[in-house]
């Protein structure tokens, strides 16, 4: 119990310092917090967010949150499926790795804004386009971690399976994938945060269809509604944290009982 309190003390202290700095910055900018003044608030203090989170604004934020959650979950699911399959294929054949790896790196380093016009031409500015952006942004860490995890299996373990005349499928299923699972889950946790970023970025570029959190942030910004804009950004952060924590819990459930990186 005492160790848990000590472990929690650090994050709580950092959070309190962050809130204190937020107040200092908010008031040091000489914001006019009076709604009657007509002047836009640059950075609202934290307590102002609770005042702004009401009625129609709350309803719009929750609606946008559901839309962005659907986009992020769909994109992350596709990234996980495709990323693990591609990572496995690259680990089983060097020619596949040599053929795909340069293109995956090129896709990772290409600014998404350079791809968007082509996507609008091919797909249109719709839900599919948003999901495609999410997949492009989040798939790389899953592929790279899957490949790294499988290639990191100790050669002596491969020799042991070969002595038993095990097939490549058996080696993959009983040795490589279990040994690579910690790395795969690490990639999934990184991709979870990137999937939320992809969903938000997709909203900025694709303005048609139901507005997600990204479109709502733009709307509040253009209308000088700093409080609702900050609230929407915090909900986007919370969505990313939720996905990250979910994969952390799943990681503990799946491999926590036997792998030292989780069990200790």
Residue ranges and their predicted role:
Residues 1-28:
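N-terminal signal-anchor/first transmembrane alpha helix
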Residues 104-141, 148-149:
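Generic hydrophobic transmembrane alpha-helix motif, especially the helices
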Residues 145-184, 213, 217:
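Short cytoplasmic-facing helical segments at TM-TM junctions of multi-pass membrane proteins
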Residues 182, 230-264:
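C-terminal transmembrane helix and the adjacent membrane-cytosol boundary/short C-terminal tail
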Residues 29-77:
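Periplasmic/extracellular loop-to-transmembrane helix junction in inner-membrane transport proteins
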Residues 74-104:
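Transmembrane-helix boundary motif in ABC transporter permease subunits
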Residues 132-136, 169-202, 247:
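Transmembrane alpha-helices
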Residues 134, 187-238:
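Non-cytoplasmic
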